[in-house]
Amino acid sequence: MTSFREFAETCQAIEKISSTIETTNKVADLLKKVDVEELPLATHFIMSEVFPAWSGEQLGIGTSLLYSSLSKASGMSVRSIESLIRTTGDIGETALLILKEKRKNQVTFSSFLEEQPELSITEVYQRFKTASEASGKGSQELKIKNLQFLFNSSTPREAKYISRLALEELRIGVGEGVVRDAIARAFSVPSDKVEHAFMVTNDLGIVAAAAKEGGIEALESLGIEINRPIKMMLSQISPDIDADIRDMKGAAIEWKFDGARVQIHKNGNSVTLFSRKLENVTNSLPDLVEIIRKHVKAESAILDGEAVAVDENGKPRAFQEILKRFRRKYDVEEKALGIPIQLNLFDIMYLNGRTLIDLPLVERRKALESCVESSVEDSKSISVDEQVITGDLELVEKIYREALNAGHEGVMVKNPNSAYSPGKRGKNWLKKKPLMETLDLVVVGAEWGYGRRANLIGSYSVACYDPETSRFLQVGKVGTGLTDEQLKELTEMLSGLMEGGEAGGVFAIRPKVVLEIAFEEIQKSPNYDSGFALRFPRFIRIRDDKDPEEADTIQRIGRVYSQQLKRL
């Protein structure tokens, strides 16, 4: 087994590195050393996650529980720990300092270490897993007991990364891109083989183990599996949609629905539904499960579509209404009657044992149509999104206007010859929408309100994502456009994510919540680490169907800024 100390030393070394290439080399060195059985665990750990994102498993450890565990392990009061965190701004550095002080005061610590076996990566994982599975009476005590064991068994440096890992935020800037390249480097396999294996498994832990054990052949043997969701292909806004359609020499035009993305896995009579964030939402949508059972005539399939909340006339309701269905855990049947769903299918990635993602869209479309049966009457609950392949710009505009008149967002413009690229955003899927510019940004800081809103968070620091460094870069603050109800909802969502100091009522927020923000323009600014600032930002809606890594990137911020200059 590989010691957790070796993992912590790698993290410490990476923290001191600014070069992506050097970081990749350090991760590759670690992966080479780790036993193949532990490789999936180490791979996820280095990306600040305990469980694979697709698994649905939640660690469920908040800051208060972590502080209590550290308090019991060290003898320091929770209040003193919170005070120290306000100074350091980091639970990891705080744990390091506390355990250093404790060890210094333990005369017999050397003999303690001799008796105590080294923590392994597997031991840390098992303790986290036991804590995550605790429920019901006594569950908090069990969680604390397992974390306390880890702190008592660790060196100060190990405690630093155990505490950060408990909050799934190592702060070392290692994301999927770095790990993907590190796997290729560590096991001398082509990066495109690693990339494709990741696309079909959605699990770099599985990919790393396969590359180590069997090289290229093992990577090529990996494929899509039912009930292991893959990332959804993404679209981007085009600055010149007409030029893009001409470049495609005919594009596939589909309505763009203002609903919630859903990935459907069917295996016999069993149906599992996953949200855009790959959360299992099957129990919240029993009516959708029955619709799939009735109308999808395939033994096994993985489908992509959009679920739209509709009124009694089949007209689309607001986006927030469908999210109420996805979030629902109780009185699900009652909610289904109050907010009926229409499912619009537009792609298929797997059919009866065959992976389809490498096929062109036109062929996937035929496969989709062959396995979905619905009449005109059925189309109120399920349909294959109507598609027209054309290069006629006037016809595209006509379809676009029809979509808007029907209450939808606009149209999708797709390359008919494109493969399905899980998790990728590019020019093969473009969207045409009305011209109000918005960005999906992550909350990284906040400030309490004033007056009657003194008990609510009133201002939010928002950031874009840098996929090259896995960091979030601030682009501004937003405090307008929110109702009291929305302020209450956001305060509840963010209350468990607060960390760091509270000077002037300002505090840091762990990057978990995504907001859609409108703005007048983007300006260059030295005030934020992104180098940009939003002018007159205002809140539009919460995007809790998106993960932080799906937020708009620093590259998109730069593109929008450049496009503004061209319009001047």
Curated annotation (Swiss-Prot):
Residues reported to bind ATP: 254, 261, 276, 306, 346, 425, 431
Cofactor names: Mg(2+)
Enzyme class, broadest EC rank: ligase
GO BP annotation list: cell division; DNA biosynthetic process; DNA recombination; DNA repair; lagging strand elongation
Listed CDD domains: Adenylation_DNA_ligase_Arch_LigB (cd07901), OBF_DNA_ligase_Arch_LigB (cd07972)
Xref: Gene3D superfamilies: DNA ligase, ATP-dependent, N-terminal domain, DNA ligase/mRNA capping enzyme, Nucleic acid-binding proteins
Reactions this protein catalyses: ATP + (deoxyribonucleotide)n-3'-hydroxyl + 5'-phospho-(deoxyribonucleotide)m = (deoxyribonucleotide)n+m + AMP + diphosphate
Residues annotated as catalytic: 256
Purpose: DNA ligase that seals nicks in double-stranded DNA during DNA replication, DNA recombination and DNA repair.
EC number: 6.5.1.1
Protein family: Belongs to the ATP-dependent DNA ligase family.
InterPro entries: ATP-dep_DNA_ligase (IPR050191), DNA_ligae_ATP-dep_bac/arc (IPR022865), DNA_ligase_ATP-dep (IPR000977), DNA_ligase_ATP-dep_C (IPR012309), DNA_ligase_ATP-dep_cent (IPR012310), DNA_ligase_ATP-dep_CS (IPR016059), DNA_ligase_ATP-dep_N (IPR012308), DNA_ligase_N_sf (IPR036599)
Keywords, in A-Z order: ATP-binding, Cell cycle, Cell division, DNA damage, DNA recombination, DNA repair, DNA replication, Ligase, Magnesium, Metal-binding, Nucleotide-binding
Annotated SUPFAM superfamilies: ATP-dependent DNA ligase DNA-binding domain, DNA ligase/mRNA capping enzyme, catalytic domain, Nucleic acid-binding proteins
Natural source organism: Methanosarcina acetivorans (strain ATCC 35395 / DSM 2834 / JCM 12185 / C2A)
Gene Ontology MF annotations: ATP binding; DNA binding; DNA ligase (ATP) activity; metal ion binding
Protein name: DNA ligase 2
